């Protein structure tokens, strides 16, 4: 794609946004203790939790990748979001209260509370490596590509360094509070900007184009695809996507850390429901524009360039600056979230175990230093991503091999009181070995089977190993089950207490509304 010049007004809007977002992040972000630095003091209300969760989830994969996939295959890519909302209701109902009540700082810490430290170190190590070399580096690389469209002569590494400094400037000094303060503004800008872009798409013939697709029954506006579909076969919607969704929404430190900052279980649950509602809206503000772009900009070779193309080609002066700010907001918000969550993993899962005498202030200092090292490594690695081709699809497929063993450990830990540390660690390691074998000899084992259909095989295998190996060792101690396992009695007690509150304060009502909306969307676009 050729470079596109923007005028002074748009440049000024972008610069003012960058200055404003740093100021917002630092204004209330001074933290001296671990609870404040890593979890914002656990004081966030539901609407802040929801906006922050949504902003952190809109990564380069979502904003650029999903619009690109929509351009290439149609609305079927929204199945990931649709399934994700169902998973969010499940997460808020069963897992979130255990996370918050147990007082954990990191998701791997939950595995130690429920099982043992081996499972914690294994999962935390995987998260740190993936966050640095895939997520953080990917966000930096995506941001650099967008700026290269505007300033083709600029050095890629220099652009990456600038974005790294931008995100680090408000995340490292203030921790999660700074990140969340910035994410609130970024979420609003992202939503408003995406609505503006959607309006521009519809104003340029998008509505008539979508109407013609619906009338003709075109496959591009169908969520449910044939089993042979290369994008999202219908069976994958049932057996594959929910597993990946649980990993993304319930086991992902970057996202769950926002929920852990909630001031109560109820506020956290409502925040998740709010984020779920915003996630459903991505059908209209991210996916539909990608489909419409097939009509407006046919023949683009790289689908991942669709979103930047729409922004640069459709919007006038002023609005272009706002939308570019929204695009940068998504990328910097993601980077900030990854940076803070990864430093939390290193500090609380590893350093705090090594230096057991470290006080709160020292943990914060270590967290800041870890953030600095992480962003430097990611910035150095980011330019190498261009050598790997379609990283987003590659990462999505890799997740289908990484996620099932981890999801199996969490599900068994929460819903089986007999599962123990030996079984969990065996399931994680055995799942990793089998996943590696499946990856290396996938064609010989599964032929041309879609990766979403491979997920249940790995999940069932990992569940079976955890169950079988757990039988070879004593049941876990009673203290291992406190605030780490689901209790039917507690669920019934909660049901009785919720019967006494107003319906609009009942998170289950809003969860039910989200599930109904998911069903309606699935029916309309079946």
Where are these regions (language model features)?
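Membrane-embedded helix-loop-helix hairpins and adjacent transmembrane boundary segments
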Residues: 1-526
């Amino acid at each position: 794609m050729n470079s596109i010049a923007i005028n002074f007004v748009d440049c000024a809007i972008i610069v003012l946004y960058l200055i404003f977002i740093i100021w917002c992040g630092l204004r209330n972000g001074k933290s001296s203790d671990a609870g404040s630095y890593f979890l914002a003091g656990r004081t966030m209300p539901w609407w802040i939790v929801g906006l922050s969760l949504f902003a952190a989830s809109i990564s380069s994969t979502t904003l650029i990748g999903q619009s690109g996939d929509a351009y290439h295959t149609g609305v079927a890519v929204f199945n990931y979001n649709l399934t994700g909302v169902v998973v969010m209701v499940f997460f808020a109902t069963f897992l979130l209260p255990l996370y918050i009540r147990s007082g954990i700082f990191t998701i791997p810490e939950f595995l130690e509370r429920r099982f043992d430290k081996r499972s914690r170190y294994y999962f935390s190590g995987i998260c740190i490596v993936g966050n640095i070399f895939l997520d953080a580096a990917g966000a930096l690389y995506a941001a650099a590509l967008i700026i290269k469209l505007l300033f083709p002569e600029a050095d890629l590494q220099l652009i990456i360094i600038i974005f790294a400094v931008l995100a680090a400037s408000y995340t490292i000094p203030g921790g999660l509070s700074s990140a969340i303060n910035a994410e609130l503004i970024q979420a609003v800008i992202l939503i408003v900007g995406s609505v503006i872009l959607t309006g521009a798409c519809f104003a340029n013939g998008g509505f008539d184009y979508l109407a013609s697709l619906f009338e003709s029954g075109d496959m591009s506006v169908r969520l449910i695809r044939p089993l042979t579909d290369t994008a999202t076969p219908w069976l994958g919607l049932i057996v594959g996507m929910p597993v990946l969704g649980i990993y993304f929404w319930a086991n992902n430190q970057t996202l769950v850390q926002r929920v852990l900052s909630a001031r109560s279980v109820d506020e956290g649950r409502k925040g998740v429901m709010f984020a779920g509602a915003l996630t459903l809206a991505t059908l209209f503000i991210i996916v539909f524009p990608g489909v419409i772009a097939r009509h407006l900009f046919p023949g683009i070779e790289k689908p991942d360039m669709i979103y930047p193309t729409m922004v640069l080609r459709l919007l006038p002066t002023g609005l272009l600056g706002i939308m570019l700010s929204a695009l940068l907001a998504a990328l910097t918000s993601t980077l900030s979230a990854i940076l803070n969550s990864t430093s939390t993993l290193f500090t609380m899962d590893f350093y705090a175990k090594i230096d057991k005498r470290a006080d709160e202030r020292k943990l914060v200092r270590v967290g800041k230093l870890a953030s600095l090292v992480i962003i430097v490594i990611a910035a150095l690695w980011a330019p190498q991503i261009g050598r790997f081709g379609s990283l987003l699809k590659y990462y999505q497929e890799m997740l289908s091999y990484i996620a099932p063993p981890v999801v199996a450990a969490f599900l068994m830990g929460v819903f089986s009181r007999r599962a123990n540390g030996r079984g969990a660690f065996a399931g994680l390691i055995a799942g990793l070995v089998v996943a590696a074998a499946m990856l290396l000899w996938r064609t010989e084992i599964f032929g041309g089977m879609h990766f979403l259909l491979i997920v249940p095989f790995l999940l069932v295998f990992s569940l079976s190993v955890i169950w079988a190996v757990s039988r070879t060792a004593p049941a876990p101690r009673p203290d291992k089950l406190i605030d780490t396992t689901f209790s039917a009695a507690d669920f019934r007690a909660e049901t009785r207490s919720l019967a006494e509150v107003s319906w609009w304060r009942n998170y289950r009502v809003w969860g039910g509304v989200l599930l109904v909306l998911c069903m309606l969307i699935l029916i309309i676009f079946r």
